[in-house]
Each structure stands twice: as structure tokens, then as C-alpha cells.
């Protein structure tokens, strides 16, 4: 089945290149996420500039475009090595989308979707780690960073044959968050709900 893997890698990259954040913002008449808010075309920035509905739509689409190519390849019996490359291709498409001038997001939701076919137990633990970190800290970026750091250990515990490709995905996510890591270190990172607190202060009930 590895003979079909190169084609699946291309399909995964093209799926990843469909930037849902940009498309949803266009459809909803919202500002371009590449030039508004944090400048990152992802669900968190769409939440800041467009609200929950648009952000949820972006999040679901970004997860699916990572999940479906990997899931399809998994069902076809593609080996863990090639599955890892397919997952990375989907994330590379999200980060450097061919359809949008190679300027994309950070790949967190797409990476999560790509890991999901490995097992629902792993998916639940990963989602719980991200959510707990965000709830305790208020930083979406910190949730992504902590999840990326811990993901290889989770995978080693649940499905050790996927440890290497997931480790490569984690490195990619961490590299894309180098600016966030610097801002967190300097205590300059914006918390995910800061916008909503400011809005309530401006528009008291």
C-alpha cells in the first residue's frame, strides 16, 4: 500500500492548503485574519476578530483537513512512516498554503486532526491537555506548546510505532510558535479572552 502514499502526501498538502480562516472571514464579511488581530489565519485569531461561530467553523474545518487524509491512508493500510509524512504534509499545507501565497497559520488544529486517527483515547488525552492548559493559563498558544511537548510521550504510551512521526509534527508546531514562546517569556502574550473582557467593560449591561 506504500505505492499510493506519495499521492496521498500530495492530496494531504492540497487539503491543508485550503485556509478555512481566510474563506470563513470572506464569507462572513470579516477582516482578513492575515492583517487583523494577531495576523495568524487560525481559529484563535478568528475568535478575536469574528466571534465564536466563525471560530468554531474554522476549527472544525482545520481539524478535518488534517484528519481525513490520514484517516483514509490509515484505512488503506499505509505504514506508520508514510502516515507520518501524510500528516506532516497536511500541516505544511496549512502553514504554507499554495492557494494563499504560502502564508498560513500555525497548524495546531490540523496537527490535532492528523493525530486523531491513531486512536480516540490519545485524542481525548491531547484535547484534555490543551483545554486544561488554556483554562489554567488563559493562553491558547501555551496550550498548543504544552500539547506539542507532551504529544510524543502520549503517543509512545498508546501507540509507540507512531512516536517518530508525531515527534516530527511536534517539532514543526514548536518552530511555528517561536514568536509566542518569546512573548510568553516576556509576559507580552495576549490571553484568549482579553478581547471579551474589554468588550464587557465598554458595553456594561
Curated annotation (Swiss-Prot):
It holds the Pfam family G3P_acyltransf. Probably interacts with PlsX. It catalyses: sn-glycerol 3-phosphate + an acyl-CoA = a 1-acyl-sn-glycero-3-phosphate + CoA; a fatty acyl-[ACP] + sn-glycerol 3-phosphate = a 1-acyl-sn-glycero-3-phosphate + holo-[ACP]. Its EC number is 2.3.1.15, 2.3.1.n5. Residues 1-3, 74-80, 133-137 are periplasmic. Residues 25-52, 102-111, 159-205 are cytoplasmic. Belongs to the PlsY family. It is found in: Cell inner membrane. It is an enzyme of class 2 (transferase). The chain crosses the membrane at residues 4-24, 53-73, 81-101, 112-132, 138-158. One of its GO terms (molecular function) is acyl-phosphate glycerol-3-phosphate acyltransferase activity. Pathway: Lipid metabolism; phospholipid metabolism. Keywords: Cell inner membrane, Cell membrane, Lipid biosynthesis, Lipid metabolism, Membrane, Phospholipid biosynthesis, Phospholipid metabolism, Transferase, Transmembrane, Transmembrane helix. The gene is plsY. This is Probable glycerol-3-phosphate acyltransferase. PANTHER family: GLYCEROL-3-PHOSPHATE ACYLTRANSFERASE-RELATED, INNER MEMBRANE PROTEIN YGIH. NCBIfam families: glycerol-3-phosphate 1-O-acyltransferase PlsY. One of its GO terms (biological process) is phospholipid biosynthetic process. Catalyzes the transfer of an acyl group from acyl-ACP to glycerol-3-phosphate (G3P) to form lysophosphatidic acid (LPA). This enzyme can also utilize acyl-CoA as fatty acyl donor, but not acyl-PO(4). One of its GO terms (cellular component) is plasma membrane. InterPro entries: G3P_acylTferase_PlsY.
Amino acid at each position: 500500500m506504500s505505492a499510493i502514499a506519495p499521492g496521498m502526501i500530495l492530496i494531504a498538502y492540497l487539503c491543508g492548503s485550503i485556509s478555512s480562516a481566510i474563506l470563513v472571514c470572506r464569507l462572513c464579511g470579516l477582516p482578513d485574519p492575515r492583517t487583523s488581530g494577531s495576523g495568524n489565519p487560525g481559529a484563535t485569531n478568528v475568535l478575536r476578530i469574528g466571534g465564536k461561530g466563525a471560530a468554531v467553523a474554522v476549527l472544525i474545518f482545520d481539524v478535518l483537513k488534517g484528519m481525513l487524509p490520514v484517516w483514509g491512508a490509515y484505512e488503506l493500510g499505509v505504514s506508520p512512516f508514510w502516515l507520518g509524512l501524510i500528516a506532516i504534509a497536511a500541516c505544511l499545507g496549512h502553514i504554507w498554503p499554495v492557494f494563499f501565497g504560502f502564508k498560513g497559520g500555525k497548524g495546531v488544529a490540523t496537527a490535532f486532526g492528523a493525530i486523531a486517527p491513531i486512536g480516540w483515547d490519545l485524542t481525548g488525552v491531547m484535547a484534555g491537555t490543551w483545554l486544561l492548559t488554556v483554562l489554567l493559563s488563559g493562553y491558547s498558544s501555551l496550550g498548543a506548546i504544552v500539547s506539542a511537548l507532551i504529544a510524543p510521550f502520549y503517543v509512545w504510551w498508546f501507540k509507540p510505532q507512531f512516536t517518530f512521526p508525531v515527534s516530527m509534527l511536534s517539532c514543526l508546531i514548536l518552530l511555528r510558535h517561536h514568536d509566542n514562546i518569546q512573548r510568553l517569556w516576556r509576559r507580552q502574550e495576549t490571553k484568549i479572552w482579553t478581547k471579551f473582557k474589554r468588550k464587557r467593560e465598554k458595553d456594561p449591561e
